[in-house]
UniProtKB/Swiss-Prot annotation:
Organism whose genome encodes this protein: Penicillium expansum (Blue mold rot fungus)
Record's catalysed reaction(s): isoepoxydon + NADP(+) = phyllostine + NADPH + H(+)
Protein function: Isoepoxydon dehydrogenase; part of the gene cluster that mediates the biosynthesis of patulin, an acetate-derived tetraketide mycotoxin produced by several fungal species that shows antimicrobial properties against several bacteria. PatN catalyzes the conversion of isoepoxydon into phyllostine. The pathway begins with the synthesis of 6-methylsalicylic acid by the polyketide synthase (PKS) patK via condensation of acetate and malonate units.
Inactivation phenotype: Strongly reduces the production of patulin, shows significant slower colony expansion, and leads to the production of a distinct dark-red pigment.
Protein name, as recorded: Isoepoxydon dehydrogenase patN
Keywords associated with the record: Cytoplasm, NADP, Oxidoreductase
Lineage of producing organism: Eukaryota, Fungi, Dikarya, Ascomycota, Pezizomycotina
UniProt record similarity statement: Belongs to the short-chain dehydrogenases/reductases (SDR) family.
UniProt gene name: patN
C-alpha cells in the first residue's frame, strides 16, 4: 500500500515562498502535484524553473510568484483574489512570511506586528470566502517554539508576535471549523536554512550554536524540508481531523507538556 497525501490538483497559497522553509514548502507541494501561488518581497518567477525538471514524469504542477510586501493589506487582498481567479479556487493557505526580528526597537515591533500578526489576520480574512468552497480547506501559520516559551533571549518582537499567532489559531479553529476549514500552526525550533538566522549565528558565534545544538534532545539542528513535510501533512486529507493544533517541529527542545 502506497500512502498518498491526496494533494494532487490542490491549489495552495504560500507567503514568503522564495527561500528557507517557505521555499522548501513550495518544493514539497509541487512534488505532491499541487499548484502553488507564492509571494515575497522580491520575485523573479524563475525561482523554480530548475526544480521542475526534478518532478516525476507527468507532474505538471507549477508555482507562480508575485512580488509585494505582506504588510500591505491592499496588495495582500489583491494577490489572494488574483490567485483564486488564476487557480480557479483556493484549498490551502500558509502564512509563512516573517521579518524574524530578534531585536526590540520600536520599528522591529511595528514590522513584526504588521507581518507576523496582521499579515496572518488579513490573509485569512481575504481567503476565507474561497476556502469555504473547498472540500479540503486548510489554514496553516508558521509560528515558532519561541511563541510558546521563553528562549533565554533579550526582550524582542519575534516571540510575542508568534504567540499571538498561536492564540489566533485557537480562535479561528473554533470559528471556522463549522465551515469545514481546519486551522493549525507549525512551530519550528532551531532550523538551519540557507541565508537564515541560524546560518548567520553559525558564522558569527559557532560556540553558542554548538551549545544550543547540545540542548536539543536529537542533538542537531533541523532542516527546512523537515518543516515542509509537516506543512504537507497538515494541508492534506491525512490530517482531516486535525485542527486547532500547534505542531512542534523542534527536535524535542521544548520544555513542559503541551495541553
Amino acid at each position: 500500500m502506497v500512502l498518498t497525501t491526496g494533494l494532487k490538483g490542490a491549489h495552495v497559497l504560500i507567503t514568503g515562498g522564495t527561500r528557507g522553509m517557505g521555499e522548501a514548502m513550495v518544493h514539497k507541494f509541487l512534488q505532491e502535484e499541487a499548484n502553488v501561488s507564492y509571494c515575497a518581497r522580491t520575485v523573479t518567477n524563475t525561482e523554480y524553473d530548475d526544480f521542475y525538471s526534478t518532478l516525476a514524469e507527468g507532474n505538471t504542477a507549477r508555482a507562480v510568484g508575485t512580488a509585494f510586501d505582506v504588510a500591505s493589506k491592499d496588495s495582500l487582498v489583491k494577490w489572494v483574489e488574483s490567485s483564486a481567479e488564476r487557480l480557479g479556487r483556493i484549498d490551502v493557505i500558509i502564512a509563512n512570511a516573517s521579518p524574524m526580528h530578534m531585536e526590540g526597537e520600536t520599528e522591529h515591533w511595528e514590522s513584526s506586528f504588521a507581518i507576523d500578526v496582521m499579515g496572518f489576520v488579513e490573509l485569512v480574512k481575504a481567503a476565507t470566502p474561497y476556502l469555504e468552497k473547498s472540500p479540503q480547506a486548510s489554514i496553516i501559520v508558521q509560528s515558532s517554539f519561541m511563541g510558546r516559551e521563553f528562549y533565554r533571549s533579550p526582550p524582542a518582537a519575534y516571540g510575542p508576535c508568534k504567540a499571538a499567532q498561536l492564540q489566533h489559531v485557537q480562535e479561528l479553529s473554533h470559528f471556522l471549523g463549522p465551515k469545514g476549514i481546519r486551522v493549525n500552526a507549525i512551530s519550528p525550533g532551531p532550523v538551519l536554512c540557507k541565508g537564515g538566522p541560524w546560518e548567520l549565528y553559525s558564522k558569527i558565534n559557532p560556540e553558542w550554536v554548538e551549545e544550543q545544538r547540545l540542548k536539543i534532545p536529537l542533538k542537531r539542528l533541523g532542516g527546512p524540508t523537515e518543516v515542509a513535510n509537516v506543512a504537507v501533512f497538515l494541508a492534506s486529507p491525512l490530517a482531516s481531523f486535525v485542527s486547532g493544533t500547534n505542531m512542534l517541529v523542534d527536535g524535542g527542545i521544548h520544555v513542559g507538556t503541551q495541553f
